[in-house]
């Protein structure tokens, strides 16, 4: 691995770890430590976690922090295809280790909560606690319905990321772009979070989900108690949604801007 790519991977690892540390940490505070957060507060914390992670690591790697974003930028924004797999591996590892760190810090609180409420890990009753680390759909949603939600919200996310980072589209956002992306994520979370937990990011979901699998929740962490394992949805739907969103932005907006020059 050359020095430049190594720095890129460090940036993606650390940036993804930061956003998971803040996001999963706030959910842990809500679920097991008695914090009084509502949907909007949680959405804001996730969004600001993303913004801070981008500010911290954009100079190293561009701060994709999301395999769906990396793949969409490869297909539609000239990102080097040789970096796609290393970026995704770094993002997954960062998310996994951040989830492990949050659990290590909250471990005794988890154990006390389970003891008081007579919860056994790996049983259906423990699914809510597994949801500290990753996302699961509202019980009323089918797998197909959850897939549609994740596809749509990730398409919107990706299209607006491209709009907010395209200096040819209106006033250049410059240093404000990460903050605006964080606000975008918070707004999506506030609007659609109750449906699927607004994963929109395979690394954000699978890295912590796999940690929960190893930490005692077992297959329940991966399946979500569904016949079709739920982990497939936030792995696949965000990638397809990001591709659709990037394509739509390029076709409907980016390609019609007077200063759009395409990839060089």
Swiss-Prot record:
Catalysed conversion reaction: glycerol(in) = glycerol(out)
Motif interval(s): NPA 2: 201-203
One Pfam family matching this protein: MIP
Compartments (UniProt record): Cell inner membrane
Periplasmic face residues: 33-37, 107-141, 193-196, 215-229
Membrane topology: Multi-pass membrane protein
Residue ranges that the UniProt entry lists as topological domain Cytoplasmic: 1-3, 59-61, 77-82, 168-175, 253-264
Motif annotated as NPA 1, chain positions: 66-68
Protein name: Glycerol uptake facilitator protein
Organism taxonomic ancestry: Bacteria, Pseudomonadati, Pseudomonadota, Gammaproteobacteria, Pasteurellales
Gene name of the encoded protein: glpF
């Amino acid at each position: 691995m050359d020095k430049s790519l190594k720095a890129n991977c460090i940036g993606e690892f650390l940036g993804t770890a930061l956003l998971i540390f803040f996001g999963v940490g706030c959910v842990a505070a809500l679920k097991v430590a008695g914090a009084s957060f509502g949907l909007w507060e949680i959405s804001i914390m996730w969004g600001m976690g993303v913004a801070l992670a981008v500010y911290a690591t954009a100079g190293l790697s561009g701060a994709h922090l999301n395999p769906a974003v990396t793949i969409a930028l490869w297909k539609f924004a000239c990102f080097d295809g040789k970096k796609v797999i290393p970026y995704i591996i770094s993002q997954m590892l960062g998310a996994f280790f951040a989830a492990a760190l949050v659990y290590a810090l909250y471990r005794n609180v988890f154990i006390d909560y389970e003891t008081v409420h007579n919860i056994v890990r790996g049983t259906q009753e423990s699914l809510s606690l597994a949801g500290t680390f990753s996302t699961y759909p509202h019980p009323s949603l089918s797998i197909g319905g959850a897939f549609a939600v994740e596809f749509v919200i990730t398409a919107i996310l990706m299209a607006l990321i491209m709009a907010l980072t395209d200096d040819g589209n209106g006033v250049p956002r410059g240093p404000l772009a990460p903050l605006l992306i964080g606000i975008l994520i918070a707004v999506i979370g506030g609007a659609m979070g109750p449906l699927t937990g607004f994963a929109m990011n395979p690394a954000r979901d699978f890295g912590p989900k796999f940690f929960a699998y190893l930490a005692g929740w077992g297959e329940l962490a991966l399946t979500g108690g569904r016949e079709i394992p739920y982990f497939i949805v936030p792995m696949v739907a965000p990638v397809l949604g990001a591709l659709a969103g990037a394509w739509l932005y390029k076709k409907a907006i980016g390609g019609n801007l007077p200063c759009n020059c395409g990839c060089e």
